[in-house]
């Protein structure tokens, strides 16, 4: 009994002593990656490749402005809307209050992944450019047809885009009963 207790106590001391002694590290970055050295460790550096990737989207709302509706907008949805195995990108958008007062609006944007590190804006072709004060969004298959649908939470009425399975979407907000003008954040 004493021998078992001693063994258990020794094992616990060993475990506690070695807890957190090692730090898991991933593989080193490829030779072409930008890196810096910090305390002898290689740290990868991020490079902005937005333009090279073909993404020309600009979020127009102004979070530093005085109206709360401006500070709560913005969202990014990753989805494979055409089920080709590559993630596509949907950006939500909202105008500033000043833009809205002048009758201007802001649309979200859907970018198709070209499988080569670039993207193509397919917003108009896909039919997902309805302007709104977007607060965020979600992706899901609301009708269980196997295709990802897009739900955008908006101040002034949410938008539900049904994926038609052919690269296009249909706005079914009213039919689905989600176009309530109550402010909803996502």
Give residue ranges: language-model regions:
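Acidic, glycine/proline-rich Ca2+-coordinating loop motifs
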Residues: 1, 18-186
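Bacterial N-terminal signal peptides
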Residues: 6-18
């Amino acid at each position: 009994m004493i021998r078992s207790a001693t063994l258990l106590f020794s094992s616990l001391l060993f475990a506690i002593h070695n807890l957190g002694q090692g730090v898991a590290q991933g593989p080193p970055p490829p030779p072409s990656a930008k890196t810096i050295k910090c305390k002898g460790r290689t740290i990868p550096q991020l490079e902005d490749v937005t333009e090279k990737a073909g993404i020309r989207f600009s979020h127009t709302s102004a979070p530093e402005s005085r109206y709360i509706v401006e500070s709560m907008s913005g969202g990014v949805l990753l989805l494979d809307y055409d089920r080709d195995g590559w993630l596509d990108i949907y950006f939500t958008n909202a105008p500033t209050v000043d833009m809205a007062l002048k009758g201007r609006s802001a649309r979200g944007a859907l970018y198709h992944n070209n499988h080569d590190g670039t993207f193509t804006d397919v917003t108009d072709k896909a039919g997902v450019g309805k302007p709104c004060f977007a607060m965020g969004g979600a992706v899901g298959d609301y009708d269980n047809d196997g295709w990802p649908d897009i739900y955008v939470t908006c101040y002034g009425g949410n938008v539900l885009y049904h994926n038609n399975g052919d690269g296009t979407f249909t706005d079914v907000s009213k039919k689905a009963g989600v176009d309530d003008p109550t402010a909803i954040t996502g």
